[in-house]
Swiss-Prot record:
Keywords: Ribonucleoprotein, Ribosomal protein, RNA-binding, rRNA-binding
Originating gene: rplV
Alphabetical list of Gene3D superfamilies matching this protein: Ribosomal protein L22/L17 (3.90.470.10)
Protein name: Large ribosomal subunit protein uL22
Residues spanning the membrane: none
Alphabetized InterPro entries for the sequence: Ribosomal_uL22, Ribosomal_uL22_bac/chlpt-type, Ribosomal_uL22_bac/org-type, Ribosomal_uL22_sf
Homology family: Belongs to the universal ribosomal protein uL22 family.
Length: 91
């Protein structure tokens, strides 16, 4: 059974987040949590929060035991960009 958790519009670049996501792909849940806790990257708390959300979804919504869970798939896509306007004379 596949359990899903989604995080949208995170305030960090996808390139930095992909580095952390590659570390836990295919790992056991406990091993992935340990890796994320001790990784000194700025994206690791965001990915750890998302992983905990996926674990909570599995245990509460689907009544699955968290000892048998692993990270099957994790991917990072680019979100919306902030458009900034600088009001000044342009000519």
């Amino acid at each position: 059974m596949n359990v899903k958790a989604i995080a949208k519009q995170m305030p960090i670049t996808p390139r930095k987040t992909r580095l952390v996501a590659d570390l836990i792909r295919g790992k056991n849940i406990k091993e992935a949590q340990a890796i994320l806790m001790f990784t000194p990257k700025s994206a690791s708390p965001i990915v750890l929060k998302l992983l905990k959300s996926a674990i909570a979804n599995a245990t509460n919504n689907f009544s699955l035991d968290d000892k048998n869970l692993y990270v099957k798939e994790i991917f990072v896509n680019e979100g919306l960009r902030l458009t900034r306007l600088f009001p000044r004379a342009k000519g």
